[in-house]
Each structure stands twice: as C-alpha cells, then as structure tokens.
Amino acid sequence: MTSLSKSFMQSGRICAACFYLLFTLLSIPISFKVGGLECGLSFTVTLFTLYFITTTLNVLARRHGGRLYIFFTNCLYYSQHFIIASLLYLFLSGFSNDELGNVLKNKYNESESFLEALKNSLNSNQINYVLYYYYYRFVVQPWQFVLTKSTPFFTLSEGFFTILAIQAVGETNRWLSNDLNSNTWIISSLLTSGGVITASLYYLYRIYVTPIWPLSIQTASLLGLVLSMVCGLGLYGIVSQKGSVIESSLFFAYIVRCIYEISPKLATTATDEILNLFKDVWQKHQRNLPTADNLLCYFHNVILKNAEVLWGSFIPRGRKKTGDFHDKLISILSFEKVSLISKPFWKFFKNFTFSVPLSINEFCQVTIKMASESVSPAIVINLCFRVLMFYSATRIIPALQRKNDKQLRKSRRIMKGLYWYSPCILIAMYTHLILQYSGELKKDLCIWGCSEKWFGVDQPEIIVDSWGFWNWCNIFCTILVYATELIGSGS
C-alpha cells in the first residue's frame, strides 16, 4: 500500500471519527430532551450495541479473516455513522406515541412471555409498541442499572488519570526548563501557574458567597481540611523539588473543580458564567468589525445576479437586417432562440442551486436550535475533560511501565483494543453525565445500617447523596495518590 493511499485512508478515518463525535454530541441530548428518559436510554443502548457488535466483528476479521472480510467489516463499521439520524427519528417517533407511554407505565401483560406476547399481538396495531416495551424491559433497564452503578468507576478513575496527566505535564515542563536550559519556559510556566491559581481562588471564593450551594458546618470543615492538605502538598512539592509550580497549580485547580462537581447546579452555573463572559467579549469585538451578509445571501445577491447579467449580455437587444443566406443561418442559430430553448433549464438550475442550500441551511438551523436547547455546556466540558484524561492515561501508562518486548507488545494490544472500543466508552460516559446532570441517577446512597445481616439490629441508617459522596471520595483519593507519589518519588 502506497503512502498516498495510507494517507487517504487515515484522512477518511479522521473524518468519520469527527462525524461520529459531532452526531453523538448532538443526537444523544436531543433524544433525552425531546423523547424523554426512556427514549434517550433506548437510543444510547442501541448505539452502544451497534458499535460493540461491529467493532467485535472488525477485530475478529482483522485477526482471523481475509481481506474481503476486513473490507466488509470496515464498510459495516463506518456505514453505521450514517444511520444515527435515522435511529434518532425512529425512537423519537416511537416514544412520542401515548400508547407506548401507557404500556410502559402499566407494565403491559407482565405475566406473558416474550413469544406469547408477540403471538397474541400479531393481529393488533400495537405490535411495534409491544416490541418497544420488551426491548426497554430486557435491554434498556439493565443498561440503566449499569450506568447508575458506574458512578464510582467514572469518578475515581478520572481522579487517578488526572494525577497522571498533571505529573506528565510537570515532567515535560521540567525537561523543557532544565534540559533545554530555556528561561522562556520557566517564565511562561510561572505566568501560567499564576493565572491558574488566580482563577481557582476566584471560583473558590464564589463557592463561599453563592447562595446556590448552602454550606453546612460539616461541609465547610471538610472544605477547610481539603484546602489545607492541597496547599501543604503543593508547597512540599515545590520546596522539595519533587514537584513543580505548574504541577501544584494544576492540582489545586483540579481540586477546586471537584468541589464544584459536588453540586451539579453549582457546576452548571459556573460554566454558564464562563460562557457568557466569552460571549460578551466576542460580541463586543464583533461590533467593531464590518458586518457582512452570510454565504447564502452572497450567493444569491452576487453570483446569481452576475450570472443573469452575463446571460443577458449574450442575448441581442435588437433585430438586425439579414440579407444573405449566411445571415439567415446565423439568425436561426442566434442566441435569442437558443435562450428560449434553454431558459427553462436555466430557471431550473437557478432555483435548484438556491433552494437546495437554503433547505439544507434551514434543516441545519432546526438541528442546531434543538441541540442548543438540549446540550448542556457543563456536560460537554466535563465529557471533553474526561475523554482527554482517559486518552492521556492510555499514552502515559505504557510509557511508565518498563517491560520487555513481549510485554510491551501485549500492552500495546490492550491499548489498541481500548481505542477500538472507545466509541462504546464515550457513549456510556456521555449518557452517565446526562443522567447525572438531569437528576435521573439514584441520589440516595446508604452507607450504614442498610442490612440487618451485616450491621446488626437497631442500627441507624445513614443515607447520603450518591454523587456528592463519590466526589468527596474522589477528592480524598486524589490527594492520597498525589501525596504517595510525592513522598515516594526521588527528587
């Protein structure tokens, strides 16, 4: 395979990945916002299953199949990107029906088996909704259960991977400053650290003054303990030269972010404030720029009008006197008669070239409007942050492990498998964030007195908020991991 064909295939994969990311970011929130919880869960588990099956077939074909099977599975894998919109429309149209809602609420014929229900409903108009119900019951509900119980995994793994990324940034900055002997990197790292610490202190101040999250005595005490430990670890890393200024500032900023994540409403408000600030700055600078028409208006007002003027210049304005045979032949084949014949084609071409982009523009505007009303900036920012941390971990962990060639190849195969199944991980992560910020996750978590068998009789139940509890666990686990790395590492 030539380098040109490899570059072409790589470009195609990148375009398909961007197309998939865009459609995933837009379609999943729309399914939850428009269709409801059941529609969103059904749509996401269908996407997850499709990507899991096609990825597995692709991996098996690459390992055991020939070129024909590899080509077929590749086509199957990349073609599913184009059916996301059709799947979204299918589930939106299905769950918008009132009959299906009644079926889901009343648990339609729960005593019957799946085959019996299908057999009894063959002559009924509700066969599609029966299929929807059982699909929801046997596929979607386990998916919802897994997402509900996966909060500790996503939260704690994010903290661990973030520590790896922070230390990788610190090592890179240390190499740029010492090995290259460049004062520019030292000054830039100090300026960056100062900006990060200033922004973190500002948003830490907002936590104490905002009425969105009322602080109790226990919460304020925990915050004071956490901030004291973080500042102490940061100063210890700088003084002992086991860390750096950029590491300490990023670590402090991440802990402040985790504190915001304890309250989803607080995190959403902070994200909206940041985006509104960027929006105000952009609008202020945009007023100073000369406004111009958009591309479609330019296409209609300039290009089409110039084409009409050019076309009209070919048409003779007056009739000339024709005396000889040559002039008669020219008059027969004149531009006037040619224009009469080709005028309908020109009108069709003109209307087609304007109406089709206009319809596409209207469709895109409707989609963007639905997406803007459905997509939460806090969810997208959290998703991008988690994807970045998880991707960084897949690069950092193999680099930290000193292995022989055989173990290194095995580690690379594992990381390659993670890359192959990354769409499934992304769908699960995105759906979990949407459920978290919409309040659909199980909020109550019993940590004491839940079972008489384990805790004994007459033990008081201690029930806490699930999301807040696991975020506090993430904060303390992250501090513990970073402290272990600082104390256990050499200077």
Curated annotation (Swiss-Prot):
Matches recorded under InterPro entries: Ice2 (IPR013635)
Example GO biological process: intracellular zinc ion homeostasis
Mode of membrane association: Multi-pass membrane protein
Residues in the Cytoplasmic compartment per record: 1-13, 62-74, 171-184, 240-294, 395-413, 483-491
A GO CC term attached to the entry: perinuclear endoplasmic reticulum
Entry-linked Pfam families: ICE2
Molecular function, one GO term: protein serine/threonine phosphatase inhibitor activity
Alphabetically ordered keywords of this record: Endoplasmic reticulum, Membrane, Transmembrane, Transmembrane helix
Lumenal-side positions: 35-40, 96-149, 206-218, 316-373, 435-461
Subcellular location per the Swiss-Prot or TrEMBL entry: Endoplasmic reticulum membrane
TM regions (residue ranges): 14-34, 41-61, 75-95, 150-170, 185-205, 219-239, 295-315, 374-394, 414-434, 462-482
Miscellaneous field: Present with 606 molecules/cell in log phase SD medium.
PANTHER family assigned: PROTEIN ICE2
Name of the protein in its database record: Protein ICE2
Species, as recorded: Saccharomyces cerevisiae (strain ATCC 204508 / S288c) (Baker's yeast)
Name of the encoding gene: ICE2
